[in-house]
Amino acid sequence: MKLLIKNGHVLDVKTGLDRVTDILAVDGIIHEVGSKIDEAGCEVIDATGLYVTPGLVDAHCHLRDPGYEYKEDIESGTRSAAKGGFTSVACMPNTNPVLDNEAMVKYVINKAKTDGFLNVFPIGALSKGLKGEELSEIGELKFAGAVALSDDGRPVGNSSLMKKAMQYASMFDITIISHCEDLDLVDEGLMNEGYQSSILGLKGNPAPAEEVMIARDLILAEYTKATIHIAHVSTELGVDLIRNAKRRGVKVTAETCPHYFTLTDNACEGFNTNAKVNPPLRTQKDVDAIIQGLKDGTIDIISTDHAPHHIDEKNVEFKIAANGMVGFETAFPLAVTYLVKPGHLSLKELVYKMSFNPSQMLGLNKGTIEVGKLADLIIFDLNEEYKVNITEFESKSKNSPFNGLLLYGQPQYTIVGGTPVVRKKVLL
């Protein structure tokens, strides 16, 4: 199969390519990048006036498969991801059964091959059963195909266990993704502790509950010389802690999510359960710090933390509603609208944070447009506005606080291995 993308503004952060040109993919591989490529025998996409970049890579999502398929499964989750411009996703292990052994890791890999619309990479559980008591067989998980380790959804509260995990992970050259949360400080808090929680009469989850654990993990990473990735950073001090650790030479990368640079805890007004996430939405001061961290490189990656929940888990009182929101289909447009359009990031910097950097952190061979590499690409109009409509989401779940929002940059084409899976915004 030959696919020719003509006259698109091709942007690639690794090669420095930033011009209008053509891309020819043959049998899924990028064969040529240049002008006036022969169209004979090709399926042609006219990308005039559009940007062509490497496909997005999500380093943090929840596909809920196995065990929670009523919320999402590998088919519906990857359909949703493809619609949002993702060509590769790494899924967290908090499934049922947990992804804490070779069989479960291979289950995800094999099911993704038959049911998935894009590349799926499982993240293995750091501890057995996500209980934080005993390390999983890290070597077994790595050799089975896990691309990282995490107990995401719960913190590793035992500092000794985390220290050992870092030492073993270093031996197997695999990164730990840390969900930083001190449950004693959370103390059953439901949203950010502050003015809004007081107004709503809801128990608060203080910023130090996140920051204390970020500090602990940075200290342990510095001591063990391990590589650590801090998930879903949401606070000003959290950004400062990571910035200072990087200056000291700690091998740390960090991510945030679109809701942490677009929303504050004001979104919880009216007891809006679609704005209930973990870590919670913070204050405008924290949002500003997250944006600054993205600008100065402290925060390397934008992930979705796509967390689908059935309507029955959200359409309840705030106290018992599930944490999380869906993110695949709004992440890139939110980043374009709130980061690129205001001038906080260039489009090239955004591609770094949503494609190249997550690929590097996970050790994937993705995030670039080079001859000989798989043709994982997206095509989009930076200036076309659209309105978010949750009824059009491909995800089984619709728990998003962004319904009705006007955004820019919705992907028009998503191409995985040289094959279009989304064409003119329609999933094929």
Swiss-Prot record:
GO BP annotations, alphabetical order: 'de novo' UMP biosynthetic process; purine nucleobase catabolic process
GO molecular function: allantoinase activity; dihydroorotase activity; zinc ion binding
CDD domains: DHOase_IIa
Pfam families, per the entry: Amidohydro_1 (PF01979)
Sequence similarity: Belongs to the metallo-dependent hydrolases superfamily. DHOase family. Class I DHOase subfamily.
Xref: NCBIfam families: pyrC_multi
Function field: Catalyzes the reversible cyclization of carbamoyl aspartate to dihydroorotate.
Protein's name in the database: Dihydroorotase
Lineage: Bacteria, Bacillati, Bacillota, Clostridia, Eubacteriales
